[in-house]
Design a protein with these regions (language model features):
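Regulatory sensory and allosteric helical modules in signal-transduction proteins
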Residues: 1-27
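Signal-transmission/dimerization alpha-helices at domain junctions
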Residues: 8-12, 46, 71-89
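Regulatory loop-to-helix N-cap segments in sensory/regulatory domains
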Residues: 56-74
Length: 349
Protein backbone atom coordinates (compact mmCIF):
# COMPACT_ATOMS: atom_id res chain seq x y z
CA UNK A 1 0.00 0.00 0.00
CA UNK A 2 2.61 2.55 1.11
CA UNK A 3 5.22 1.23 -1.31
CA UNK A 4 2.74 1.52 -4.18
CA UNK A 5 1.96 5.09 -3.18
CA UNK A 6 5.65 6.06 -3.04
CA UNK A 7 6.34 4.37 -6.38
CA UNK A 8 3.43 6.26 -7.91
CA UNK A 9 4.03 9.72 -6.42
CA UNK A 10 7.86 9.61 -6.13
CA UNK A 11 7.42 11.22 -2.67
CA UNK A 12 8.57 9.93 0.72
CA UNK A 13 6.06 8.88 3.41
CA UNK A 14 6.21 9.06 7.22
CA UNK A 15 3.45 7.06 8.96
CA UNK A 16 2.69 7.06 12.72
CA UNK A 17 0.45 4.92 14.95
CA UNK A 18 0.30 2.03 12.51
CA UNK A 19 -1.42 -0.27 15.02
CA UNK A 20 -4.37 2.13 15.18
CA UNK A 21 -4.37 3.02 11.48
CA UNK A 22 -7.26 1.17 9.83
CA UNK A 23 -5.58 1.21 6.42
CA UNK A 24 -2.28 -0.17 7.70
CA UNK A 25 -2.79 -2.28 10.80
CA UNK A 26 -3.90 -5.42 8.93
CA UNK A 27 -1.01 -5.37 6.46
CA UNK A 28 0.72 -8.73 6.97
CA UNK A 29 4.26 -7.45 6.43
CA UNK A 30 3.83 -4.64 8.95
CA UNK A 31 2.13 -6.96 11.40
CA UNK A 32 4.98 -9.47 11.19
CA UNK A 33 7.56 -6.75 11.80
CA UNK A 34 5.50 -5.24 14.60
CA UNK A 35 5.99 -1.76 13.17
CA UNK A 36 4.52 1.18 15.08
CA UNK A 37 5.85 3.84 12.70
CA UNK A 38 7.56 3.70 9.35
CA UNK A 39 9.32 5.69 6.67
CA UNK A 40 9.37 4.81 2.99
CA UNK A 41 11.30 6.95 0.49
CA UNK A 42 12.15 6.45 -3.18
CA UNK A 43 15.61 6.03 -4.70
CA UNK A 44 15.18 8.22 -7.77
CA UNK A 45 17.14 8.60 -10.98
CA UNK A 46 15.82 11.26 -13.33
CA UNK A 47 12.09 10.45 -13.60
CA UNK A 48 12.35 6.81 -12.54
CA UNK A 49 12.17 5.11 -9.15
CA UNK A 50 15.00 2.61 -8.90
CA UNK A 51 14.01 1.23 -5.52
CA UNK A 52 12.77 2.08 -2.03
CA UNK A 53 14.31 2.62 1.39
CA UNK A 54 12.20 1.43 4.34
CA UNK A 55 12.78 2.36 7.97
CA UNK A 56 10.65 0.92 10.81
CA UNK A 57 10.29 1.53 14.53
CA UNK A 58 8.71 -1.21 16.64
CA UNK A 59 8.81 0.85 19.84
CA UNK A 60 5.64 2.93 20.35
CA UNK A 61 7.59 5.28 22.65
CA UNK A 62 10.21 6.00 19.97
CA UNK A 63 8.19 6.93 16.93
CA UNK A 64 10.02 8.01 13.81
CA UNK A 65 10.05 11.79 13.35
CA UNK A 66 10.47 14.38 10.60
CA UNK A 67 14.25 14.46 11.19
CA UNK A 68 14.35 10.71 10.53
CA UNK A 69 12.51 11.28 7.25
CA UNK A 70 15.01 13.95 6.18
CA UNK A 71 17.91 11.64 7.07
CA UNK A 72 16.38 8.75 5.09
CA UNK A 73 15.81 11.03 2.10
CA UNK A 74 19.49 12.01 2.23
CA UNK A 75 20.52 8.34 2.34
CA UNK A 76 18.26 7.61 -0.64
CA UNK A 77 19.83 10.49 -2.55
CA UNK A 78 23.31 9.10 -1.90
CA UNK A 79 22.16 5.64 -2.99
CA UNK A 80 20.72 7.17 -6.15
CA UNK A 81 24.09 8.73 -6.98
CA UNK A 82 25.89 5.44 -6.34
CA UNK A 83 23.44 3.50 -8.52
CA UNK A 84 23.69 6.12 -11.28
CA UNK A 85 27.49 5.92 -11.23
CA UNK A 86 27.36 2.12 -11.30
CA UNK A 87 25.01 2.18 -14.28
CA UNK A 88 27.26 4.66 -16.09
CA UNK A 89 30.29 2.48 -15.42
CA UNK A 90 28.45 -0.68 -16.55
CA UNK A 91 27.40 1.12 -19.72
CA UNK A 92 30.99 2.21 -20.30
CA UNK A 93 32.25 -1.35 -19.77
CA UNK A 94 29.83 -2.68 -22.39
CA UNK A 95 30.63 0.16 -24.79
CA UNK A 96 34.36 -0.24 -24.28
CA UNK A 97 34.17 -3.96 -25.01
CA UNK A 98 32.33 -3.21 -28.23
CA UNK A 99 34.87 -0.54 -29.13
CA UNK A 100 37.72 -2.86 -28.19
CA UNK A 101 36.48 -5.37 -30.74
CA UNK A 102 36.32 -2.62 -33.35
CA UNK A 103 39.76 -1.38 -32.35
CA UNK A 104 41.32 -4.79 -32.93
CA UNK A 105 40.12 -4.57 -36.52
CA UNK A 106 40.99 -0.90 -37.00
CA UNK A 107 44.24 -0.44 -35.13
CA UNK A 108 46.54 -2.08 -37.64
CA UNK A 109 48.98 0.62 -38.67
CA UNK A 110 48.99 0.16 -42.43
CA UNK A 111 52.28 0.84 -44.16
CA UNK A 112 55.74 -0.52 -44.90
CA UNK A 113 57.57 2.76 -45.38
CA UNK A 114 60.58 3.64 -43.27
CA UNK A 115 58.52 6.27 -41.45
CA UNK A 116 55.81 3.78 -40.48
CA UNK A 117 58.36 1.17 -39.42
CA UNK A 118 59.87 3.74 -37.06
CA UNK A 119 56.41 4.57 -35.65
CA UNK A 120 55.71 0.88 -34.98
CA UNK A 121 59.07 0.47 -33.24
CA UNK A 122 58.40 3.52 -31.04
CA UNK A 123 54.95 2.21 -30.12
CA UNK A 124 56.41 -1.19 -29.20
CA UNK A 125 58.97 0.46 -26.89
CA UNK A 126 56.66 2.94 -25.20
CA UNK A 127 53.47 0.84 -24.89
CA UNK A 128 54.73 -1.28 -21.99
CA UNK A 129 55.65 1.80 -19.93
CA UNK A 130 53.41 4.25 -18.08
CA UNK A 131 54.99 7.29 -19.75
CA UNK A 132 52.84 10.13 -21.04
CA UNK A 133 53.02 10.29 -24.84
CA UNK A 134 52.65 13.32 -27.12
CA UNK A 135 51.66 12.36 -30.68
CA UNK A 136 52.37 15.04 -33.28
CA UNK A 137 51.50 15.37 -36.93
CA UNK A 138 49.25 17.09 -39.42
CA UNK A 139 45.49 16.74 -39.30
CA UNK A 140 44.33 13.41 -40.71
CA UNK A 141 47.61 11.48 -40.41
CA UNK A 142 46.21 8.99 -37.87
CA UNK A 143 47.28 10.31 -34.46
CA UNK A 144 44.30 8.66 -32.76
CA UNK A 145 45.24 5.37 -34.41
CA UNK A 146 48.68 5.63 -32.79
CA UNK A 147 47.06 6.28 -29.39
CA UNK A 148 44.85 3.21 -29.85
CA UNK A 149 47.84 1.06 -30.80
CA UNK A 150 49.70 2.24 -27.68
CA UNK A 151 46.71 1.36 -25.49
CA UNK A 152 46.05 -2.06 -27.02
CA UNK A 153 49.70 -3.06 -26.67
CA UNK A 154 49.99 -1.83 -23.08
CA UNK A 155 49.33 -3.50 -19.70
CA UNK A 156 46.16 -1.37 -19.59
CA UNK A 157 44.63 -2.97 -22.69
CA UNK A 158 41.79 -4.56 -20.69
CA UNK A 159 40.90 -1.14 -19.29
CA UNK A 160 38.97 1.57 -21.11
CA UNK A 161 40.31 3.82 -23.85
CA UNK A 162 38.53 7.17 -23.65
CA UNK A 163 38.98 9.73 -26.45
CA UNK A 164 38.16 13.44 -26.28
CA UNK A 165 38.70 16.25 -28.79
CA UNK A 166 39.70 19.30 -26.75
CA UNK A 167 38.89 21.72 -29.60
CA UNK A 168 35.28 20.58 -29.95
CA UNK A 169 34.02 22.09 -26.67
CA UNK A 170 33.97 25.43 -24.87
CA UNK A 171 36.24 25.79 -21.84
CA UNK A 172 33.44 25.21 -19.32
CA UNK A 173 32.05 22.20 -21.17
CA UNK A 174 35.54 20.74 -21.64
CA UNK A 175 36.19 20.95 -17.90
CA UNK A 176 32.87 19.21 -17.23
CA UNK A 177 33.66 16.49 -19.81
CA UNK A 178 37.13 15.89 -18.38
CA UNK A 179 36.36 15.99 -14.67
CA UNK A 180 32.60 15.45 -14.43
CA UNK A 181 30.00 17.55 -12.64
CA UNK A 182 27.56 17.34 -9.77
CA UNK A 183 23.82 17.77 -10.11
CA UNK A 184 22.99 21.48 -10.18
CA UNK A 185 26.59 22.55 -10.85
CA UNK A 186 25.37 24.71 -13.75
CA UNK A 187 22.28 25.31 -15.85
CA UNK A 188 21.33 22.04 -17.50
CA UNK A 189 23.23 19.83 -15.03
CA UNK A 190 20.14 17.84 -14.05
CA UNK A 191 22.11 14.76 -12.99
CA UNK A 192 25.53 13.93 -11.63
CA UNK A 193 27.95 12.89 -14.39
CA UNK A 194 31.35 11.24 -14.13
CA UNK A 195 34.07 12.76 -16.30
CA UNK A 196 36.37 11.21 -18.87
CA UNK A 197 39.18 10.82 -16.34
CA UNK A 198 36.97 8.78 -14.01
CA UNK A 199 35.69 6.76 -16.96
CA UNK A 200 39.30 6.05 -18.01
CA UNK A 201 40.39 4.74 -14.58
CA UNK A 202 42.87 1.85 -15.02
CA UNK A 203 42.98 2.64 -18.73
CA UNK A 204 44.09 5.33 -21.15
CA UNK A 205 42.71 8.76 -22.02
CA UNK A 206 43.48 10.25 -25.43
CA UNK A 207 43.30 14.05 -25.54
CA UNK A 208 43.24 15.19 -29.16
CA UNK A 209 44.07 18.78 -30.15
CA UNK A 210 45.56 19.45 -26.72
CA UNK A 211 47.03 22.71 -28.02
CA UNK A 212 43.52 24.24 -28.13
CA UNK A 213 42.96 23.78 -24.38
CA UNK A 214 42.45 27.04 -22.44
CA UNK A 215 44.82 28.00 -19.56
CA UNK A 216 42.26 27.36 -16.79
CA UNK A 217 41.68 23.78 -17.89
CA UNK A 218 45.42 23.34 -18.50
CA UNK A 219 46.08 24.08 -14.82
CA UNK A 220 43.60 21.44 -13.65
CA UNK A 221 44.98 18.90 -16.14
CA UNK A 222 48.50 19.56 -14.88
CA UNK A 223 47.47 18.70 -11.31
CA UNK A 224 46.04 15.37 -12.49
CA UNK A 225 49.22 14.59 -14.44
CA UNK A 226 51.19 15.29 -11.27
CA UNK A 227 49.16 12.58 -9.51
CA UNK A 228 46.96 14.91 -7.48
CA UNK A 229 43.23 14.27 -6.95
CA UNK A 230 40.59 16.45 -8.59
CA UNK A 231 36.99 17.43 -7.92
CA UNK A 232 33.98 17.33 -10.18
CA UNK A 233 32.62 20.71 -11.27
CA UNK A 234 30.40 21.91 -8.42
CA UNK A 235 31.63 19.18 -6.08
CA UNK A 236 33.87 18.93 -3.04
CA UNK A 237 34.78 15.24 -3.05
CA UNK A 238 38.41 14.48 -4.00
CA UNK A 239 38.73 11.87 -6.74
CA UNK A 240 41.94 9.95 -7.45
CA UNK A 241 42.41 8.07 -10.71
CA UNK A 242 45.04 5.86 -12.30
CA UNK A 243 45.09 6.90 -15.96
CA UNK A 244 47.68 6.99 -18.71
CA UNK A 245 47.52 10.15 -20.83
CA UNK A 246 48.23 10.19 -24.55
CA UNK A 247 47.86 13.66 -26.07
CA UNK A 248 47.98 14.81 -29.67
CA UNK A 249 48.41 18.10 -31.48
CA UNK A 250 48.91 19.50 -34.95
CA UNK A 251 50.01 22.93 -33.72
CA UNK A 252 53.45 24.21 -32.74
CA UNK A 253 53.33 23.83 -28.94
CA UNK A 254 56.77 25.40 -28.57
CA UNK A 255 55.48 28.65 -30.11
CA UNK A 256 52.34 28.41 -27.98
CA UNK A 257 54.55 28.18 -24.88
CA UNK A 258 56.59 31.19 -26.00
CA UNK A 259 53.39 33.18 -26.64
CA UNK A 260 51.96 32.25 -23.23
CA UNK A 261 49.03 30.32 -24.72
CA UNK A 262 50.25 26.99 -23.36
CA UNK A 263 51.72 26.35 -19.93
CA UNK A 264 55.40 25.51 -19.97
CA UNK A 265 55.11 23.09 -17.03
CA UNK A 266 52.24 21.24 -18.73
CA UNK A 267 54.25 21.08 -21.97
CA UNK A 268 57.09 19.29 -20.18
CA UNK A 269 54.65 16.95 -18.43
CA UNK A 270 53.14 15.95 -21.77
CA UNK A 271 56.41 15.87 -23.69
CA UNK A 272 57.89 12.82 -21.95
CA UNK A 273 57.83 10.74 -25.14
CA UNK A 274 57.12 12.23 -28.57
CA UNK A 275 55.91 10.28 -31.60
CA UNK A 276 55.78 12.21 -34.86
CA UNK A 277 53.46 10.73 -37.48
CA UNK A 278 54.58 11.51 -41.06
CA UNK A 279 52.21 13.04 -43.60
CA UNK A 280 50.90 10.81 -46.39
CA UNK A 281 52.85 12.77 -49.04
CA UNK A 282 56.04 11.81 -47.17
CA UNK A 283 55.22 8.09 -47.37
CA UNK A 284 53.58 7.71 -50.75
CA UNK A 285 54.82 4.14 -51.04
CA UNK A 286 52.12 3.27 -48.47
CA UNK A 287 49.26 4.62 -50.62
CA UNK A 288 48.55 1.32 -52.48
CA UNK A 289 48.42 -0.62 -49.18
CA UNK A 290 46.15 1.95 -47.56
CA UNK A 291 43.92 2.29 -50.62
CA UNK A 292 43.38 -1.46 -50.94
CA UNK A 293 42.81 -1.82 -47.19
CA UNK A 294 40.10 0.86 -47.22
CA UNK A 295 38.58 -0.52 -50.43
CA UNK A 296 38.23 -4.03 -48.99
CA UNK A 297 36.80 -2.83 -45.71
CA UNK A 298 34.40 -0.22 -47.12
CA UNK A 299 33.11 -2.37 -49.98
CA UNK A 300 32.35 -5.12 -47.45
CA UNK A 301 30.41 -2.63 -45.31
CA UNK A 302 28.17 -1.56 -48.20
CA UNK A 303 27.86 -5.06 -49.65
CA UNK A 304 29.62 -4.41 -52.97
CA UNK A 305 32.14 -6.64 -54.76
CA UNK A 306 34.94 -4.49 -56.17
CA UNK A 307 38.04 -6.08 -57.68
CA UNK A 308 40.38 -3.16 -57.08
CA UNK A 309 41.70 0.00 -58.76
CA UNK A 310 42.44 0.56 -62.41
CA UNK A 311 46.09 1.34 -63.21
CA UNK A 312 45.26 4.95 -64.07
CA UNK A 313 43.24 5.37 -60.85
CA UNK A 314 46.19 4.15 -58.77
CA UNK A 315 48.60 6.43 -60.67
CA UNK A 316 46.28 9.34 -59.91
CA UNK A 317 46.27 8.46 -56.20
CA UNK A 318 50.08 8.31 -56.21
CA UNK A 319 50.47 11.70 -57.93
CA UNK A 320 48.19 13.60 -55.56
CA UNK A 321 49.72 15.39 -52.53
CA UNK A 322 46.94 14.57 -50.01
CA UNK A 323 46.73 17.73 -47.86
CA UNK A 324 44.08 15.94 -45.78
CA UNK A 325 46.36 12.90 -45.41
CA UNK A 326 44.99 9.41 -44.67
CA UNK A 327 41.58 10.77 -43.66
CA UNK A 328 41.18 12.38 -47.09
CA UNK A 329 42.24 9.15 -48.82
CA UNK A 330 39.70 7.14 -46.85
CA UNK A 331 36.91 9.63 -47.57
CA UNK A 332 37.69 9.63 -51.29
CA UNK A 333 37.62 5.83 -51.49
CA UNK A 334 34.41 5.66 -49.45
CA UNK A 335 32.75 8.09 -51.86
CA UNK A 336 33.94 6.02 -54.85
CA UNK A 337 32.65 2.81 -53.26
CA UNK A 338 29.24 4.30 -52.48
CA UNK A 339 28.72 6.13 -55.78
CA UNK A 340 30.60 3.86 -58.20
CA UNK A 341 28.74 1.46 -60.47
CA UNK A 342 31.46 -0.83 -61.85
CA UNK A 343 33.46 -3.67 -60.29
CA UNK A 344 36.62 -1.57 -60.47
CA UNK A 345 37.49 1.88 -59.14
CA UNK A 346 38.50 4.01 -62.12
CA UNK A 347 40.06 7.47 -62.41
CA UNK A 348 36.61 8.96 -63.05
CA UNK A 349 35.33 7.66 -59.72
Amino acid sequence: FISDSVMRTHEGVLAHDISSNRALKNRQSLEEIGAESLICVPIRSEDRVLGLVHLYSTDPTKALQRDDLEFTLAVAHQLSQVVTEMKQRESLIVENERLRENLRAETSLIGQSLGMDQIKQQIARVASTHATVLVRGESGVGKELVARAIHLNSPRKLGPLICLNCAALTESLLESELFGHEKGAFTGATEQKIGKFEAAHDGTIFLDEIGEMKPGTQAKLLRVLEGQPFERVGGGKSIQVDVRVVAATNVDLENAVQDGRFRRDLYYRLHVVEIKVPSLRDRKEDIPLLANYFLERLSHEVGRRIRGFSDEAMRKLMRYDWPGNVRELKNLIERAVVLGTSEEITETD
